[in-house]
Amino acid sequence: MPKGRQKVPHLDAHLGLPICLWLELAIFFLVPQVMGLSEAGGLDILGTGGLSWAVHLDSLEGERKEESLTQQADAVAQAAGLVNAGRIGELQGHYLFVQPTGHRQAMEVEAMRQQAEAVLARHEAVRWHSEQTLLKRAKRSIHFNDPKYPQQWHLNNRRSPGRDINVTGVWERNVTGRGVTVVVVDDGVEHTVQDIAPNYSPEGSYDLNSNDPDPMPHPDEENGNHHGTRCAGEIAAVPNNSFCAVGVAYGSRIAGIRVLDGPLTDSMEAVAFNKHYQINDIYSCSWGPDDDGKTVDGPHQLGKAALQHGVMAGRQGFGSIFVVASGNGGQHNDNCNYDGYANSIYTVTIGAVDEEGRMPFYAEECASMLAVTFSGGDKMLRSIVTTDWDLQKGTGCTEGHTGTSAAAPLAAGMIALMLQVRPCLTWRDVQHIIVFTAIQYEDHHADWLTNEAGFSHSHQHGFGLLNAWRLVNAAKIWTSVPYLASYVSPMLKENKAVPRSPHSLEVLWNVSRTDLEMSGLKTLEHVAVTVSITHPRRGSLELKLFCPSGMMSLIGAPRSMDSDPNGFNAWTFSTVRCWGERARGVYRLVIRDVGDEPLQMGILQQWQLTLYGSMWSPVDIKDRQSLLESAMSGKYLHDGFTLPCPPGLKIPEEDGYTITPNTLKTLVLVGCFSVFWTIYYMLEVCLSQRNKASTHGCRKGCCPWAPRRQNSKDAGTALESMPLCSSKDLDGVDSEHGDCTTASSFLAPELDCPPHQPPDLLQGKSGQIC
């Protein structure tokens, strides 16, 4: 045996191990108890089991020192047969009395409880006491019985945590879109599906194709009129009904405007954008011009006016929120800046990424894209699970919704969550919050650039991925941005040739401080460029805009399928890549021809620059960024914290009317009848005047002119002094009448009394027949 180590007498190996274990257990229980009796730290251990009472000693705050209160607490606890475990947190005069340790029978424990209650109830130093019981608390989490909810990876991605819209934490705080109405402008909404029916808003719905209030989709040969119903389910599908799936804003109301299932006119589009705009808060539009890589189109005159009117007067003056899809023409090399809905300053343009955060094959790029959210990708990746129609081949649920058509409704639902916590967000507030909170992420296809204001943007993903948690927390403390300021340059006549690559045409325009003084514009939001260019092949043109900071925007990307020979006629491109930068400085428009064919050179005829922004300074933007980041912990996201909202404007609902073919036919018939009646009336008046010019008389008979008429003329007698017409009554007695009425006076009362004929024409005539 090694020196220094001796065997303890009578301690065999088979007894040593149990004894050591008993010693360790004794130390484990006794040491915390001793520590707990001397300080409040023991509260955590002794207060979790056995009998315990919270006791408030009768002493006013600040009147007695903590030492004396502790001594008094020890004495009261001892009198009750308990042990003072220390002060409860930071509550002065509040102590926890616990049952002394030791195993006791049930009857003994009950006797101790009664004794303690009796002592504490009658002790003069005890103001209040309460026996502590175990409270049932659970970590807040969301559980739905909807069978397809586990497959809704875009809401809660369990396979790849973090690759979702981060909405469950918002739901746990009871933010579900309550009080907000989202309308899906599409091919109809089957509102009788059980996932939609409880949240359906008939007040915000309409069918512009059939001109009735019910937007129910109509079956078609291609079984394709389920698009609007799927979008509606993404937004507001009802949870916990044991059917299909859950919507992003499942507490919101959902409406439908059926407009895409038939011929569409500019007037119908205008009506759709403003239909029930005091009821509907958000307009979700998953449609646009053809995504064929060769179309340049957008809202026409009435549609543009309706968008502008919506953001000015909709939602009691806070502005309707228009969410549009960026388009699915990626496989055709299309670009969403050729889509007038996607590059409008009045819309929120949303693109798509797949489950892995990559840009799908169908997604379009553009400088006007605001943000992206999740959708389906290729066949190996999961698509969006949502409600479906149950007409024709539909089952009421689908796992195959995809495209930017699926991304835009998710964004609309997240905006509904924002409006619940801050109903007075303006349409520009929503855009700003998206810019401030979108998350940049790595994608080898993305060309991320950080602008002068610190915002990162890519043509593929806008300012980044929408995050519901960040959006809602930012909305909770958001105060409105200043009024919209704008600057429009004069129409700049150029008439310069566009050279072929690698050469380029560069034109400049300097925006000075004086130019911006009247509007107060300091920092940018949207920048628009309107160009007129002739070119034999429009798709060969490439247009880039450089802001004063040097931030480049590819506003007009080349398109291989666009062979239109007419060029651009006053087409407006836009960019948001200069958001937050200073407005003053030199703007450069660079145009080049990247085509390979030896065609005639294009001509830049004219262009115009339009700046949109506010009087915010760069410092104001930095301060707002810091404020929002401080709110991302969720500390403001509770009902107790609410910023005051200004009252909205009282704007009456103005029902629009669509010119349907039957209505147009009716108007044509009424118009033709009106023209016929007008011609008849004019002929009647002309004939009446001609008859009066040849005849003059009175209603009751002959009207011989008195001989003194000539004398009156010679004497200069006034017109009103001329004698009245005379006629003979039934007795043959001459009488004068002051009422000269003709048969035509009923049609032309202003011609009742024709002018008197000259006396020389009356010579030789004894009278005229009426």
Swiss-Prot record:
Propeptide part(s) removed at maturation, as residue ranges: 37-140
P/Homo B domain sequence ranges: 480-617
Tissue spec. comment: Widely expressed. Expressed in brain, lung, muscle, heart, liver, kidney, spleen and thymus.
Segments forming domain Peptidase S8: 152-472
Gene Ontology MF terms: peptidase activity; serine-type endopeptidase activity
Protein origin, superkingdom: Eukaryota
Site description Cleavage, residues in chain: R140, S141
Keyword vocabulary terms for this entry: Cleavage on pair of basic residues, Glycoprotein, Golgi apparatus, Hydrolase, Membrane, Protease, Serine protease, Signal, Transmembrane, Transmembrane helix, Zymogen
Activity regulation, short description: Inhibited by zinc and copper.
EC id: 3.4.21.-
Gene3D superfamilies noted in UniProt: Galactose-binding domain-like, Peptidase S8, pro-domain, Peptidase S8/S53 domain
Annotated Pfam families: P_proprotein, Peptidase_S8, S8_pro-domain
Location of the protein in the cell: Golgi apparatus, trans-Golgi network membrane
InterPro entries, per database record: Galactose-bd-like_sf, Kexin/furin, P_dom, Peptidase_S8/S53_dom, Peptidase_S8/S53_dom_sf, Peptidase_S8_His-AS, Peptidase_S8_Ser-AS, Peptidase_S8_subtilisin-rel
Primary localisation category: Golgi
Membrane topology category: Single-pass type I membrane protein
Glycosylated residue positions: N166, N174, N240, N510
Cofactor: Ca(2+)
Residue ranges of the TM segments: 667-687
Secreted found in the keyword field: no
Gene Ontology cellular component list: endoplasmic reticulum lumen; Golgi membrane
Renumbered residue ranges of the record's region Disordered: 195-228
One biological process term in Gene Ontology: protein processing
Protein family per UniProt: Belongs to the peptidase S8 family.
PANTHER family: PROPROTEIN CONVERTASE SUBTILISIN/KEXIN-RELATED (PTHR42884), PROPROTEIN CONVERTASE SUBTILISIN_KEXIN TYPE 7 (PTHR42884:SF28)
Protein's recorded name: Proprotein convertase subtilisin/kexin type 7
Taxon lineage: Eukaryota, Metazoa, Chordata, Craniata, Vertebrata
